[in-house]
């Protein structure tokens, strides 16, 4: 059976749900797909809560771990939606997830207001460069007190302003559960939420004109066809049968040809910046590639090991370190989809860096990473984010 072609006639926007565990991110995602599939059935299918929440580890703990991808359309746009993990233990996925968003829906339970992970996710969204956040105030069916809702709204706006997001962003009152149960009033609230997404999340500025670059997130073997690497295209455009170079992490880069491109299980003739897709690589073995490498136009990008970065070190209250660090500090630097250990050299005259400080530092990585100025990274220790920065200068 020939696979359906992917429709590109509408602007394509990557979106996602972020927020505190149990505030209803996955329920909101399910409600959006259900309500849109009923209103615009020819363009949408409903994804059940369980289908979104489907990774096996999640079931035991009732928390979202893996990132679920769903798609839906409004009359104005096609959305690819990631349901980002909710639990602090899974921040690593949050970083890869949030990095795939042109805008985020921050889900806050009206019954609780902003919680520690709400703050953490907004901070992470800023670190990884999510350009816009709007708010779904969930569980509004459970709160009768208008003053209480107003108070929660004020807290949320303060939180957005703290991290330089638009404090006048739409805050839409919803009940995801009631919408899933078919309550008309709350179904309408989900449509209002999607209108707010259409109106407030700017059309993404795609980096289509730059040379092709896609960070590898995952690798699969398809029997009889070869190796497929998946990720979100960061820059440029790629046609079937184009030559590519796979570089970073390993000592040597390698060249191969892309023999197939898929998105949402549909065949594409080409992939361009912003697409989440899989690339079939000719003659490439699974062990030849790894997460964290990039697939790129040959010769367009070079891996580097030494750079200077401007870094914000999280305070203790933001979940960062409790103690200062010194010269020769060796944390992990999280670029795009992977951690690489690096050695930090502090500027002359700086003895130590305290949690909450901003600092410019020189870093030497133990493995090469394809980078250019402006690339963002997180600094992590044992799986928790302790800092965020961007590359200001490449030294080697």
Swiss-Prot record:
GTP binds at residues 19-26, 83-87, 138-141. The keyword Iron does not apply. CDD domains: EF_Tu, EFTU_II, EFTU_III. GO terms for molecular function: GTP binding; GTPase activity; translation elongation factor activity. One of its GO terms (cellular component) is cytosol. InterPro entries: EF-Tu_GTP-bd, EF-Tu_GTPase, EFTu-like_2, EFTU_2, G_TR_CS, P-loop_NTPase, Small_GTP-bd, T_Tr_GTP-bd_dom. Its EC number is 3.6.5.3. It is an enzyme of class 3 (hydrolase). Residues 62-66 are annotated as: G2. Residues 19-26 are annotated as: G1. Keywords: Cytoplasm, Elongation factor, GTP-binding, Hydrolase, Magnesium, Metal-binding, Nucleotide-binding, Protein biosynthesis. It comes from the Bacteria. Residues 175-177 are annotated as: G5. This is Elongation factor Tu. It comes from Corynebacterium kroppenstedtii (strain DSM 44385 / JCM 11950 / CIP 105744 / CCUG 35717). The lineage of its organism: Bacteria, Bacillati, Actinomycetota, Actinomycetes, Mycobacteriales.
